């Protein structure tokens, strides 16, 4: 079983960097965050619905030769396999090769798509791939800053998504069945803040303020979850925290994609942030300690502290981006391109 879990992780590892790279390749910088929000919303709906479906499948435990958890693997594995097969034809190519995709764009429409991206950042066609070209991308400090923010972000997301039923059951006194159902509701709710905040970010061309606002919402949510006395107030805190970290997933993706140009730098950044996102997930699985119920002080403190750090990094990046844009405007330096400006 451990070996199968390792295989599952290996095959899943390329999904998010691949999707992030494709989205950032197809859309202009002022359009990206809202598209990342749609991607995240789809995951949320599947995650929440999957929890409810798993709850139902687990009830079969006493009425069949197979265990409930075995039905979970069979049903979800079958659905994932079918979708994966369909995706081979459904997934589109990069803009310059879009006419090759299955019934997607004709040659004229492909040229329009390419022209949009060239006008925005002039990086449709990649340079020749080489090891030195890949390693050169790691000289950019932004890659490390964005990666570290994703690490800090996923400390919270893993703790909440995997341990929310435990928090509801042990920390708030709900039954096991009620905890499973109640754990799904915040994820359905989170679709609203991620879409709204992302639309605002794209509409007004801002990234940092949206991230900081979401961080404050998460800090308030975890404060309620960790220190409020009433169960209702603590559950409201779960909603605030879940909506905030989900919104920041799209916001951080929009932030890095808006300030990175070049196909290989995008690919390297997407891979780096995904790797650090995974490391954050590993670390996040240790911060919810059962013996700290019902307050979970370690998880509360680390979650709040991690988002204070995100605010600090965003502030530093914003100052750097502002100064760099100002230097380019005065003709004192050249950024990623002649007409490129950082988005903050």
Task: Indicate where each model-derived feature is located.
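Paired small-residue
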Residues: 2-7, 232-240
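Structural signature of the two symmetry-related core transmembrane helices
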Residues: 209-223
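Intracellular terminal tails of multi-pass secondary transporters
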Residues: 88-123, 266, 272, 295-344
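Glycine-rich segments within core transmembrane alpha-helices of 12-TM secondary carriers
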Residues: 33-65, 74-80, 270-284
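Extracytoplasmic gate region of multi-pass secondary transporters
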Residues: 132-199, 249, 253, 285
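Interfacial helix-cap and linker-helix signal at transmembrane-aqueous boundaries
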Residues: 53-64, 168-169, 200-202, 287-295
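Intracellular juxtamembrane helix-capping segments at the cytosolic ends
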Residues: 14-27, 247-262
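Cytoplasmic helix-loop-helix junction between adjacent transmembrane helices
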Residues: 4-41
């Amino acid at each position: 079983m451990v070996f199968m879990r390792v295989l599952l992780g290996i095959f899943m590892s390329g999904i998010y960097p691949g999707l992030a790279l494709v989205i950032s390749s197809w859309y202009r910088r002022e359009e990206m965050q809202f598209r990342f929000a749609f991607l995240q919303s789809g995951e949320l709906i599947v995650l929440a619905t999957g929890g409810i479906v798993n709850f139902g499948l687990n009830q079969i435990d006493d009425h069949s030769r197979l265990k409930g958890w075995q039905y979970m693997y069979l049903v979800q594995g079958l659905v994932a396999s079918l979708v994966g097969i369909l995706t081979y034809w459904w997934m589109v190519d990069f803009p310059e090769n879009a006419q090759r995709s299955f019934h997607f764009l004709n040659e004229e429409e492909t040229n329009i798509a390419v022209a949009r991206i060239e006008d925005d950042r002039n990086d449709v066609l990649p340079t020749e791939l080489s090891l030195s070209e890949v390693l050169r991308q790691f000289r950019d400090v932004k890659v490390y800053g964005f990666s570290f923010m994703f690490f800090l972000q996923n400390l919270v997301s893993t703790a909440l998504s995997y341990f929310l039923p435990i928090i509801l059951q042990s920390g708030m006194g709900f039954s096991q069945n009620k905890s499973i159902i109640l754990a799904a509701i915040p994820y359905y709710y989170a679709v609203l803040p991620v879409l709204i905040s992302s639309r605002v970010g794209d509409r007004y061309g801002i990234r940092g303020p949206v991230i900081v606002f979401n961080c404050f919402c998460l800090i308030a949510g975890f404060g309620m979850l960790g220190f409020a006395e009433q169960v209702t107030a603590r559950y409201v805190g779960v909603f605030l925290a879940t909506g905030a970290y989900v919104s920041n997933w799209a916001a951080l993706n929009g932030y890095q994609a808006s300030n990175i140009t070049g196909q290989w730098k995008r690919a390297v950044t997407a891979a780096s942030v995904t790797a650090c996102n995974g490391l954050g997930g590993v670390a996040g699985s240790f911060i919810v300690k059962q013996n700290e119920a019902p307050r979970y002080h370690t998880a509360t403190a680390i979650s709040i502290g991690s988002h204070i750090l995100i605010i600090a990094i965003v502030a530093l990046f914003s100052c750097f981006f502002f100064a760099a844009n100002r230097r380019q405007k005065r003709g004192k330096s050249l950024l990623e391109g002649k007409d490129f400006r950082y988005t903050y």
